[in-house]
A protein has these predicted regions:
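Basic, glycine/lysine-rich polyanion-binding surfaces/domains
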Residues: 1-175
């Protein structure tokens, strides 16, 4: 879904409901599905994150895709998912609207002889929620494929910590 409304008439009230975990919102994100027998090792090789253990539905990471000079090309939220129409385990990369096609082309151009395919999934939409609204979202949205959970401030495999403070305000965020 490339378009998400900015608000529904009362942005301050809507923000308060979101912050309280009483509402959810459609997010303006493109979804790129990466599938095939080699996707785990392939994405670990071409990204900044270790994804070889991302085998179970719902496991998630934040990942960057860099150019040859180390500049960020794409930032994505990666979540393992069993996509209903294909029936196979894959990873969904959630990127900013308008970036999906470019990321899919980049991933397909770097696959060489590996059994992996990246494709934009315009039929999949992204919604965001905090706290109790995650359960409400699951009850409202038909054909919910998976949820992405922000692992921060925890340490993911292959990651490191840079935060020693109190609980992060986005700890209950799901997309």
């Amino acid at each position: 879904m490339a378009f998400a409304p900015e608000h529904f008439g009362n942005p301050l009230r809507e923000q308060a409901l979101l912050a309280q975990g009483q509402a959810w919102a459609w997010l303006s994100r493109d979804v790129v599905e990466v599938s095939g027998a080699d996707w785990l090792s392939y994405l670990t090789t071409v990204s900044t994150q270790v994804l070889t253990d991302l085998e179970n539905d719902g496991q998630s990471r934040q990942v960057l895709f860099l150019d040859a000079n180390g500049h960020i090309l794409y930032a994505a939220l990666a979540v393992a998912a069993l996509v209903p129409d294909s029936g196979e385990q894959s990873v969904l990369l959630l990127v900013d609207a308008g970036c999906g096609e470019g990321l899919a082309q980049l991933l397909n151009s770097r696959r060489f002889m590996l059994r992996v395919q990246a494709q934009v999934r315009p039929d999949l939409q992204v919604a965001g929620a905090i706290g109790d609204a995650v359960q409400k979202l699951a009850g409202v949205v038909e054909n919910l494929v998976t949820t992405w959970s922000d692992p921060w401030p925890g340490i993911t495999p292959g990651g490191s910590t840079y935060f020693t403070g109190t609980r992060h305000p986005g700890a209950n965020y799901r997309a």
